[in-house]
Amino acid sequence: MTVFLSFAFLAAILTHIGCSNQRRSPENGGRRYNRIQHGQCAYTFILPEHDGNCRESTTDQYNTNALQRDAPHVGPDFSSQKLQHLEHVMENYTQWLQKIENYIVENMKSEMAQIQQNAVQNHTATMLEIGTSLLSQTAEQTRKLTDVETQVLNQTSRLEIQLLENSLSTYKLEKQLLQQTNEILKIHEKNSLLEHKILEMEGKHKEEWDTLKEERENLQVLVTRQTYIIQELEKQLNRATNNNSVLQKQQLELMDTVHNLVNLCTKEVLLKGGKKEEEKPFRDCADVYQAGFNKSGIYTIYINNMPEPKKVFCNMDVNGGGWTVIQHREDGSLDFQRGWKEYKMGFGNPSGEYWLGNEFIFAITSQRQYTLRIELMDCEGNRAYSQYDRFHIGNEKQNYRLYLKCHTGTAGKQSSLILHGADFSTKDADNDNCMCKCALMLTGGWWFDACGPSNLNGMFYTAGQNHGKLNGIKWHYFKGPSYSLRSTTMMIRPLDF
């Protein structure tokens, strides 16, 4: 309020100064200007126009002013006096203005200081509140930021661990992939080599196939020719068989005569030389049996026209006993794929697998008429036999040709041995009636004829592997042409036993 009154008082003084110290400017159409110089500052006031005499209004103003002087007398030197008077008034006004200014400055200082202090206090309180709020918010945000940072660190740790695991897995996978790539490269190389070899083999096979095809055609031509020749030979054989029957009868009669003569000679020898008879008591196992030895086992016999005695196995149990074993198979421990000389003189052990020998069989069957019995057993334990009432073989010049008559038994209604005669063949002596060499193809030594329905000296096969074996121990009319038997025994006994 004090400041407002001071400004009002200042405005009144300025108005009075404007009326007292005014002048017109001829350039501005009669406007009045009042200029005041105070120190370095100059103040110019533009006063409005008045119709009346300014003196009266000035006088009225002076009447209300506490600092006024007596009006000067109007004289000839009125203008200079008036100017002096105005200057004096201006000095007074200037002093008043300075006082007012000082007063205002002093009051304004205290009031401004108070206002500033209040403003500072209010502002400080507000700032404190704001600061407190900011501190609390900052603390909360710091806590949240710490939590977020912790979560980020945890997540980062998990991601780093997972990344490490993934890196290890990737390394392992890369290592495995590299190994597999190397293996694939090796396989490709092997495949290339195999493909090259296959191509070479295909070329060779093609050449061989062409060769085989040509050979097959040649064989077909040859078979056709052989078939025709065989048919012709069969016709000749039938004619020869008819002629041979008469010869066989004559031969049998001669053999009976020879046997009778041998018996007479034997009796004469027994009567004349007792000690010598003791050294050669048995011609075969029938003599052993008749001498009172009825247990199966190995005995020594003395065969006519043989320089030394021979150990043989005598079967005293089957069908009355007295059987001389000439062949036995049971376990495959002995190889029967042998040559002509071995089959001639025999091989093996009489107590196990063995072949008596073609020369001894010929010598025995030349003494008297003999019966042949063949005991068979398959891999399932089934037994059968074939028996021939007349059996003998020719000498070596006749290739130990087989002669049989009167087949009976349980090993098939038909005989698996050739009844009309067949020569003995081995791997080094091909005497069969086939171009294929049966002894090499079917193995062993046997009376093959044209690779006929039997071969008891073939390869031995164990149970489970004995089916589909053309080169096994076979007896066609007992188990078929490709079934290999487990056990066989060939034995002979005199017909008149």
Swiss-Prot record:
Keywords: Angiogenesis, Coiled coil, Developmental protein, Differentiation, Disulfide bond, Glycoprotein, Secreted, Signal. Residues 276-496 form the Fibrinogen C-terminal domain. The keyword Disulfide bond applies. Residues 1-19 form the signal peptide. InterPro entries: FIB_ANG-like, Fibrinogen-like_C, Fibrinogen_a/b/g_C_1, Fibrinogen_a/b/g_C_dom, Fibrinogen_CS. GO terms for molecular function: receptor tyrosine kinase binding. Disulfide bonds join 285-314, 438-451. It comes from the Eukaryota. Gene3D superfamilies: Gamma Fibrinogen, chain A, domain 1, Gamma-fibrinogen Carboxyl Terminal Fragment, domain 2. Binds and activates TIE2 receptor by inducing its tyrosine phosphorylation. Implicated in endothelial developmental processes later and distinct from that of VEGF. Appears to play a crucial role in mediating reciprocal interactions between the endothelium and surrounding matrix and mesenchyme. Mediates blood vessel maturation/stability. It may play an important role in the heart early development. Homooligomer. Interacts with TEK/TIE2. Interacts with SVEP1/polydom. Interacts with THBD; this interaction significantly inhibits the generation of activated PC and TAFIa/CPB2 by the thrombin/thrombomodulin complex. This is Angiopoietin-1. It comes from Canis lupus familiaris (Dog). The lineage of its organism: Eukaryota, Metazoa, Chordata, Craniata, Vertebrata.
